[in-house]
Amino acid sequence: MLPFTLAGALLTSLIAVANEPPITDLAFTPEAKHVVAVSQSGIHLYAWPELDHKRTIRTSTSNLHSIAFSPNGKYLAVGGGAPSEDGVVEVFSWPKGEPITRFDSHNDSVRSVIWQDNDRLLTASIDREIKLWHLEKETNSILTLKGHSRSVDAICLIGNGQTLVSTGADHSLRVWDMESGTLIRTMNQHTKPVNALELRPVRDGLPMVASAARDRTIRFWQPTIGRMVRYIRLDSEPLNIAWTNDGDRVLATCVDGRVRIIDPVEVTVTQDLPAIKGWAYALAMHPHNRSAAIGGINGQIWRIENLSEPGARSEPR
């Protein structure tokens, strides 16, 4: 297996970068030729892999935290809101970027947005609730899940979208039946708040989910049977995680700005690469190859690639 190598770019000049808000989430566009970044400064589109700024999409939502494209690539959802005031999700048409609808029934910032299908999406909020929405029903959510005692910060769907896994500041992972809205089980092995949750993309056997927490561990789970399979403790807190497309490795971006490449079977760090100068909040894997976008403090975005030359060095573009 070829090692990962790093190349990158700053979104602003070196003089202005200290004034830029952190990149909080990243997503590749459906055609995978661009990457979308969100932050307190809004929604920005960058060419991939050059990372040249191409476009800004206007939004009325403050403090954006999460971004997701619908499975058919026709819609873009972004979530955020003012802390302790409201949680908002805006849906835009894609690629035009025109506003389609807006959901604002959460009482605190939205931390995570995912799509169940092309018409329904799920949101997780600091208000401790998870809501299911339909694009044609703008006023109220069609399902609300309650059970977390603190902020819900990450969610993912397994089992053809019929089962939801959620996690957050109460240290727990919770498994929900989406048809009935009932809680199936709770898993409590993390000892500090959980930052991220990601489903392994390869479907061989039981679904596997990875979680990253402030206890500096990345844990691997089989939620359908309530089993924690294994874990690894890092020397820096992981802020975000992503599986490679083949499910063979997990990338973790950390508070020290480095990227750890983890073997989920041997639970070892196979590579440890420098990336962001500061906290690396955002991470997105390219859908067609072994490259990724990494975003973090002061508006930085870098790219990580699986190049044929192991000795290639990382340099800002």
What role is predicted for each listed range?
Residues A16-I23, R58-L64, F103-V110, L145-V152, ...:
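WD40/WD-repeat beta-propeller blade N-cap
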Residues V17-S41:
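Beta-strand-rich domains and repeat architectures in extracellular enzymes and scaffolds
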Residues P30-E31, P71-N72, Q116-N118, G159-N160, ...:
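Residue-level detector of Asp-centered blade-edge/turn motifs that repeat once per structural unit
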Residues V35, L76, L121-L122, L164, ...:
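Hydrophobic beta-strand positions that form the internal "hydrophobic ladder"
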Residues S41-H44, A82-E90, D108-R111, D127-K131, ...:
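Short coil/turn segments within WD40 beta-propeller repeats
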Residues W48-L51, W94-G97, L135-E138, M178-G181, ...:
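Short loop/turn segments that connect beta-strands within beta-propeller blades
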Residues D52-R55, E98-T101, N140-L143, T182-R185, ...:
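A structural motif specific to WD40 beta-propellers
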